[in-house]
């Protein structure tokens, strides 16, 4: 039994591209710029006073073989989306709402720019508040899961 893997895009790049390509600047009040969205390894130092930041990074991955003999390999990758702003809690909440809206739209298949990859699904898992109130640095970290299915032959 050999496993044949499809050519999958990097899951972190897939999620950050989904956010970047579907971001609507008009949805965040008080700003006319997109936040600095990207993979953790692609972003250099960013001054939060100038721009909001959204970083994506992988935290876990699993493979589950479904079925006996020839079956499916279900690949699941957990991606963290780290949203940070210096403006305040209301802006942080706006960033979070826009990210959730984009992911829900991608899952429903009605986002303007869908996943465009071999990944079958993306879904939201959990959210953590990692704000540092003494530094006035407002953060949410949202975990999402991206899933692929590959044939085992």
Please identify what each model-predicted range represents.
Residues 1-69, 106, 110-116:
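Small/polar-rich, solvent-exposed N-terminal microdomains that initiate assembly or binding
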Residues 7, 91, 136:
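Conserved acidic
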Residues 52-55, 79, 122, 142:
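A broad, low-specificity signal marking well-ordered, structured residues that form hydrophobic/aromatic
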Residues 71-88, 138-149:
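Oligomerization/assembly interface segments of phage tail-like spikes and tubes
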Residues 88-94:
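Short, conserved charged micro-motifs
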Residues 95-101:
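Short amphipathic alpha-helices in soluble, non-transmembrane regions
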Residues 101-153:
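Acidic-leaning, charged glycine-interspersed low-complexity segments
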């Amino acid at each position: 039994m050999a496993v044949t893997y499809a050519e999958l895009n990097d899951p972190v790049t897939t999620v950050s591209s989904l956010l970047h390509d579907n971001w609507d600047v008009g949805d965040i009040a008080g700003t006319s710029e997109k936040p600095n969205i990207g993979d953790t390894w692609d972003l250099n130092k960013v001054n939060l006073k100038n721009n909001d930041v959204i970083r994506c990074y992988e935290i876990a991955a699993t493979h589950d073989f479904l079925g006996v003999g020839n079956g499916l390999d279900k690949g699941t990758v957990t991606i963290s989306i780290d949203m940070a702003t210096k403006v305040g809690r209301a802006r942080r909440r706006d960033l979070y709402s826009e990210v959730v809206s984009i992911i829900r739209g991608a899952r429903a298949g009605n986002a303007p720019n869908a996943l465009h990859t071999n990944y079958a699904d993306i879904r939201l898992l959990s959210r953590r508040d990692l704000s540092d109130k003494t530094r006035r640095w407002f953060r949410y970290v949202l975990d999402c899961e991206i899933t692929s299915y590959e044939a085992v032959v």
